[in-house]
Amino acid sequence: MMFLNDITIVITTFYSEKKVIECLKSINNKCKVIVVENSGSKKIKEKLESTYQNVDCILSKENMGYSKSNNLALKMVKTKYALVLNPDTILQKDTLENFLHACGSIKDFAILAPYIQTEEVKKHTKVPSNPIPAESVKGFAMFFNIKKFYEIGFFDENFFLYFEDIDLCRKVIKNNNKIFLLPSVKIDHKGAKSVELSDDKELEFNRNWHWMWSSFYYHKKHGGFLKAFIIFFPKLITTFAKFLIFTIFRHKNKSRIYLFRLSGLFNSMIGKKSWYRPKV
């Protein structure tokens, strides 16, 4: 028989105080929660730990990014299972129980995740009731069978943001482990709402830089440099062209966006690490 205290919840945050509090409100206090706060804010740590007795908040000395932060927490997990959540998620009352029910019926799995359907798809297809085998899942909610990761490890820490979930799923499948989507599990996800800062432009620059860096790195990792170069060289040219056009016509914000996209892609192509961090 499995219990809620068999699950540890892992949440990586960066100035996400309001969002993570809403998330924590939806989590049963029988579950241990590890929050990794990348801002280094002692105020956030004190507030979370004083409000929620089941929460340990780890402050990082630097902004480590999603992969490294999650790995730090996952290596501390002592329970059978871990649920990795984005801070902008809300669990429903039966979310954790439904995960545990699936653990009892699916004996051999590495990752479980909610089955997501858009409203348009729901109109035309019947929602399945049984677990669905999958090759990849969305990274906002990933339920880990911890023992399956002792040998293969968790996230690739070269990814700061984006593609780390797809990459991990690929590694899981390559090592003959199983991934399932669960129609019974419901988790609300707001999407792209994790960070609570007034400088939206800086966050947009950061997202664009890392999207391009991670895109090329992922394709290089799994297809080799030449294949990745063939795919992304046209994108390098078009990104540079758009940067020039927006610069000439003085669209400052769009010009900077494409400059950041260009920088992220170029740095990845020449083999530099994912070094950019939002200036906040």
Where are these regions (language model features)?
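Conserved donor NDP-sugar-binding/catalytic core segment of glycosyltransferases
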Residues: 89-124
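Short, well-formed alpha-helical segments that are part of the catalytic scaffolds
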Residues: 13-29
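Short aromatic/hydrophobic "clamp" motif used to bind/position activated sugar donors
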Residues: 82
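Active-site donor/metal-binding and catalytic loop motifs
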Residues: 182-202, 215
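A short, conserved alpha-helix in the catalytic core of glycosyltransferases
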Residues: 141-144, 148-153, 158-186
